[in-house]
């Protein structure tokens, strides 16, 4: 009974990237459960309980300090049950591409900056036993010659996740850092850019939202440092840990 009651209580969640396709779904789903949900993004999410607007800048320290200060002001001494970093994006290009530097810069900003800031926020504002999720990529478990910046950025996120699970990482006691490694998410933007693709191999956003819900409430939560591959085949999605 106690576990069932705990699973039903109102939670507090911070969604980093709360106006993206997956982030918006997370905000909607958790608000519908009467959870308190804060969105952190470059634009406001009006459906969230609170929104923090990230200022665009070419300085990582500037952006990190701004977000850290504003989240600190918003939360005060209150702790959150989960920080879901679902920010990210995609850009292609090999090492010879004219757009290599520009695309690498974009990937680092969208994936590494956001994941690093989320990790620091977790050390300050996550409850003991809380959850931090990071957005990795299955493709980055191997070389990604056609998308150099993307692969580097996601590879760094995987490494960060494993570091956070180690001793003296700064994470709260009992808290877990878990990276999800999808192949392709079924978003409106992806459908628009790849209209001929096999959508039955794309992961529905709802699947990840429900997975996050389970992990937040302690159901089937993998151990900290896990890199969880999210693979959809013919409309069926499975979660499989990546081992090295």
Curated annotation (Swiss-Prot):
Outcome recorded upon mutating residue 23 to D: In HPABH4C; severe
Substitution effect: residue 17 to V: In HPABH4C; severe
Effect listed in the UniProt record for changing residue 14 to P: In HPABH4C; severe
Residues with the N6-succinyllysine modification: 73, 79, 96, 102
Gene Ontology cellular component terms for the protein in this record: cytoplasm; cytosol; extracellular exosome; mitochondrion
Residue numbers of N-acetylalanine PTMs: 2
Subunit field text: Homodimer.
Disease: Hyperphenylalaninemia, BH4-deficient, C: Rare autosomal recessive disorder characterized by hyperphenylalaninemia and severe neurologic symptoms (malignant hyperphenylalaninemia) including axial hypotonia and truncal hypertonia, abnormal thermogenesis, and microcephaly. These signs are attributable to depletion of the neurotransmitters dopamine and serotonin, whose syntheses are controlled by tryptophan and tyrosine hydroxylases that use BH-4 as cofactor. Patients do not respond to phenylalanine-restricted diet. HPABH4C is lethal if untreated.
Name of the featured protein: Dihydropteridine reductase
Organism from which the protein derives: Homo sapiens (Human)
């Amino acid at each position: 009974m106690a576990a069932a009651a705990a699973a039903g209580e109102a939670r507090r969640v911070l969604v980093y990237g709360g106006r993206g396709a997956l982030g918006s779904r997370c905000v909607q789903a958790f608000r519908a459960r009467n959870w308190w949900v804060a969105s952190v993004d470059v634009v406001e999410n009006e459906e969230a309980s609170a929104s923090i607007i990230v200022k665009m800048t070419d300085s990582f320290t500037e952006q990190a300090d701004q977000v850290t200060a504003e989240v600190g002001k918003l939360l005060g001494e209150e702790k959150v049950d989960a920080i879901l970093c679902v920010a990210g994006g995609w850009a292609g290009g090999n090492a010879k591409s004219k757009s290599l530097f520009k695309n690498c810069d974009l990937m680092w900003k969208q994936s590494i900056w956001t994941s690093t800031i989320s990790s620091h926020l977790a050390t300050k504002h996550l409850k003991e036993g809380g959850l931090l999720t990071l957005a990795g990529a299955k493709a980055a478990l191997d070389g990604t010659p056609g998308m150099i910046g993307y692969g580097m950025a996601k590879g760094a996120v995987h490494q960060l996740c494993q570091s956070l699970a180690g001793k003296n990482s700064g994470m709260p006691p009992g808290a877990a850092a878990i990276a999800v490694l999808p192949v392709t998410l079924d978003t409106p933007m992806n459908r628009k850019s790849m209209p001929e693709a096999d959508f039955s191999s794309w992961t529905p956003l709802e699947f990840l939202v429900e997975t996050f819900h389970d992990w937040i409430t302690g159901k089937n939560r993998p151990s900290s440092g896990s890199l969880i591959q999210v693979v959809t085949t013919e409309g069926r999605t499975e979660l499989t840990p990546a081992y090295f």
